[in-house]
Design a protein with these regions (language model features):
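Pol beta-like nucleotidyltransferase catalytic core
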Residues: 1-42, 52-144, 148-267
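Catalytic toxin/effector domains delivered as secreted proteins or via bacterial secretion systems
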Residues: 45
Length: 267
């Protein structure tokens, strides 16, 4: 939290060092003042967007990542699902204290106008466009579409939220899903096929990315049947899991705790 600190036990790097000098960091380099095995790298982008050189992660004791061990070989490779910055921005205490979630609108999504073909952006956009043309209740937000500064605007009032990942791979889900749970929405989700390893099966509704007509049928039926109200207990449990387990700070703490149990920490 303080780049000028020189008395620390651990170093945590979120993707990369700052490119501009800050604190003791110069030329994207930090003189290490703790044991090398007490360093953690959190990767941010999936392998379809960013490939890390072997040299960079090899400097860290642990890598929290959704990259496969094949894409990012490292002796401290640790599956880090949900280790991303939230874009749903409220004071943490307010999020923890909130018990009631009044919903006055039906369906929203956040999808930018990006249509890159080397990632899933094009398919994501095409699916969203197809659904928006056929679902008048769908409010579409996103860069180049309808700008917002905070996801709360696009989630707090809505029962349902369309979530489509930009990269489809087992174990890779992002804040697109977790932010929806924090806002107590029921996600229509196109993404990680193993998301039920983390969250209750009833807490989200899978939709096919490559079959827009089928996705439309699933969404319409769910809203007509009142699935939001039926699934509230599962959504609440998914929200609890995000707040207590599947977030950057909880998983970083778990790495440090496991190290304390098995390794050595500087006094």
């Amino acid at each position: 939290t303080d780049a000028a600190m020189t008395d620390y036990d651990w170093v945590l790097v979120y993707d990369e060092f700052p490119r501009t000098p800050v604190g003791t960091i110069r030329n994207e380099t930090e003189p290490l003042l703790c044991p090398p095995d007490q360093t953690i790298l959190i990767t941010v982008e999936p392998p379809s967007i960013k490939i890390y050189s072997r040299a960079y992660p090899s400097q860290f004791g642990t890598v929290l990542t959704t990259h496969s061990i094949r894409d990012l070989p490292h002796p401290g490779h640790t599956l880090g699902r949900g280790c991303l910055e939230w874009l749903y921005i409220k004071p943490m205490q307010e999020i923890l204290d909130q018990k009631e979630f009044p919903k006055t609108k039906m369906l929203s999504t956040i999808c930018s106008a990006k249509q890159h073909t080397h990632t899933m952006h094009k398919k994501r956009y095409d699916l969203t466009r197809y659904l928006a043309d056929r679902l008048p209740e769908l409010d579409w937000f996103g860069h180049g579409i309808r700008e917002i500064e905070n996801k709360t605007v696009a989630m707090d009032d809505y029962k349902y939220h369309l979530c489509v990942e930009n990269h489809l791979e087992p174990h890779h889900w992002t804040e697109k899903l977790s932010d929806a749970f924090v806002a107590m929405t029921l996600p229509f989700y196109a993404g990680d096929p193993l998301a039920t390893e983390c969250f209750p099966q009833e807490s989200f509704i899978p939709i096919p990315l490559d079959n827009p007509q089928k996705a439309l049928e699933i969404i319409r039926k769910a809203m007509e049947d009142g699935e939001y109200e039926k699934r509230l207990p599962a959504i609440r449990e998914a929200r609890r899991l995000v707040l207590e387990k599947y977030n950057m700070f909880a998983q970083t703490a778990a790495v440090i705790h496991n190290h304390r149990e098995t390794g050595t920490i500087r006094p």
